[in-house]
């Protein structure tokens, strides 16, 4: 476990190395997250002219969930949180967010970006292992940009169906899958 600002990173199920990475650009993104205020991200995006930095740091990606019926009463499980492009808006909308991410570096980027949020916990590790230790049910579970990769991290002959069955166990009775 480690703390970055108000964010707790639970590395209990982290295998010790990142099994997914975009390479050296992630070092640059971690530096940005550590040293550049969020209010300056658009300036950095314009200066760097990098697709990866635009993709991971643009607040435009928040639009994907801003109109969703998520309230301050909701508990959210974000599967595949990446560098936190959506984690922040989920935290502003919901009571709490448990973010699951396979990569420690991406989890660190996420934590530094949102270190002032007091309602985010990041769990680092393969979802199939992490989910066995989730202690609550969620009102909202997000699969934004990760469902199509289920065959890479769900050990099953039918990984997509298995993934949905696993997720279903963690939804409240009236829970929503996004």
Q: Across the structure, where does each feature detected by a protein language model lie?
A:
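Class I SAM-dependent methyltransferase SAM/SAH-binding core
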Residues: 93-129
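Conserved SAM-binding loop of SAM-dependent methyltransferases across substrates and taxa
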Residues: 83-94
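A short acidic, Gly/Pro-enriched loop at the edge of an enzyme's catalytic core
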Residues: 132-141
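Conserved class I S-adenosyl-L-methionine
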Residues: 73-82
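N-terminal auxiliary segments of SAM/dcSAM-dependent transferases
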Residues: 1-35
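A short glycine-rich, Lys/Arg-flanked "PGG" loop and its adjoining helix->strand segment in the class I
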Residues: 158-176
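Conserved alpha-helix/loop element of class I SAM-dependent methyltransferases that forms part
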Residues: 55-73
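A short SAM/SAH-binding and catalytic strip from SAM-dependent methyltransferases
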Residues: 140-157
